[in-house]
Amino acid sequence: MNDLKSIIGKVATGAPLSREEAASAFDSMMSGEATPSQMGALLMALRVRGETVEEITGAVSVMRAKMLRVDAPAGAVDIVGTGGDGSGSVNVSTCAAFIVAGAGIPVAKHGNRALSSRSGAADVLAALGVKIDLKPDQVGRCVQEAGIGFMFAPAHHPAMKNVGPTRVELATRTIFNLLGPLSNPAGVKHQMVGVFSRQWVEPLAQVLKNLGSKAAWVVHGSDGLDEITLTGPTFVAALEHGQIRTFEVTPEQAGLGLCGSDGLKGGDAAANAVALQSVLDGMPSPYRDVALLNAAAALVVAGRAKTLAEGVAIGRDALDSGAAAARLKHLIAVSNS
């Protein structure tokens, strides 16, 4: 084990940490050995200098080692965003998750309450009637029986309680905003991850590659959204067959029209729940289109679709047949049983 004081001293000089040094430091923080001052110093020094791929990889490896695991099928996917994009948008990845599940791909969705918006994944699911504070075996049963399960981050990452107060006091973004979406308790190997800043698209794809993901898209909308956006291009780093390639996608490539940012504005959890249900009930809207677009990308990652356009067609079938809505009803029933 590396001495935490010496690691903080190294970071203070601007020098990057090795993967092992980062893992040692984050193990100290998450096991409760580090003092609040040490945690604050390390987190802010990393933030100011800029976290490296190796540092994030080391930190995620510790998060994963300490999390409470969920059993999920080998081909399960996660659709998750970092949050913190400040958009106050509708719950895109949550809605997309039901479309993907409706298309027959098991979904092990990881999420939390709102970070910067008025409604995070946990908030909107609770408003829809889903029981979110489940034990790992109960979530596993949801994935098996309903085709989709929700892992409420605080319930699966108990070690985070040791860093929570420091994060609240710092009141600014830290490396932990990046770690959560990369630390899926079901250990999924197929991920669609939205990030709050363009600068993190390629690095997080590299982290996922380092940690054994089979296929992933890391995305950031040109309008700042931590999803694939409907207002213009989206930056993508795709991990495929052990290689990372970067490109841009647009709604038009998937056969969808552009919309203004106002079309994606959300409200509180209750309002967003009504909006999500209306999409699952087949109502046309920009929300339906952006959810279809993100579901299409997840279907590409899962190997179910070859192109975004094909993924949108599969997603439309899942919505129009009622299959996606049925997944929500089933999840509500299983999670509360």
Curated annotation (Swiss-Prot):
What are its cofactors?
A: Mg(2+)
Details of cofactor binding: Binds 2 magnesium ions per monomer.
Q: Name one GO molecular function term.
A: anthranilate phosphoribosyltransferase activity
Output the GO biological process annotations, alphabetical, semicolon-separated.
Answer: L-tryptophan biosynthetic process
Residues recorded as binding anthranilate 1, renumbered to this chain, are G81, N112
Q: Where does Mg(2+) 2 bind?
A: D226, E227
GO-annotated cellular components: cytosol
Binding-site positions, anthranilate 2: R167
Against InterPro entries, the record matches this protein to: Anthranilate_Pribosyl_Tfrase, Glycosyl_Trfase_fam3, Glycosyl_Trfase_fam3_N_dom, Glycosyl_Trfase_fam3_N_dom_sf, Nuc_phospho_transferase
Hey, what's the signal peptide range on this chain?
none
Catalytic EC class: transferase
The pathway noted for it is: Amino-acid biosynthesis; L-tryptophan biosynthesis; L-tryptophan from chorismate: step 2/5
Which Pfam families does the record associate with it? Glycos_trans_3N, Glycos_transf_3
| Annotated keywords | Amino-acid biosynthesis, Aromatic amino acid biosynthesis, Glycosyltransferase, Magnesium, Metal-binding, Transferase, Tryptophan biosynthesis
Under Enzyme Commission nomenclature, its number is 2.4.2.18
Q: Which Gene3D superfamilies match?
A: Nucleoside phosphorylase/phosphoribosyltransferase catalytic domain (3.40.1030.10), Transferase, Pyrimidine Nucleoside Phosphorylase, Chain C (1.20.970.10)
Q: Which residues bind 5-phospho-alpha-D-ribose 1-diphosphate?
A: 81, 84-85, 89, 91-94, 109-117, 121
Enzymatic reactions: N-(5-phospho-beta-D-ribosyl)anthranilate + diphosphate = 5-phospho-alpha-D-ribose 1-diphosphate + anthranilate
Tell me which SUPFAM superfamilies the record gives.
Nucleoside phosphorylase/phosphoribosyltransferase catalytic domain, Nucleoside phosphorylase/phosphoribosyltransferase N-terminal domain
Give residues annotated as binding Mg(2+) 1: S93, E227
User: What exactly does this protein do?
Assistant: Catalyzes the transfer of the phosphoribosyl group of 5-phosphorylribose-1-pyrophosphate (PRPP) to anthranilate to yield N-(5'-phosphoribosyl)-anthranilate (PRA).
Record's family?
Belongs to the anthranilate phosphoribosyltransferase family.
Q: How does it assemble?
A: Homodimer.
Protein name in the entry: Anthranilate phosphoribosyltransferase
Lineage of producing organism: Bacteria, Pseudomonadati, Pseudomonadota, Alphaproteobacteria, Hyphomicrobiales
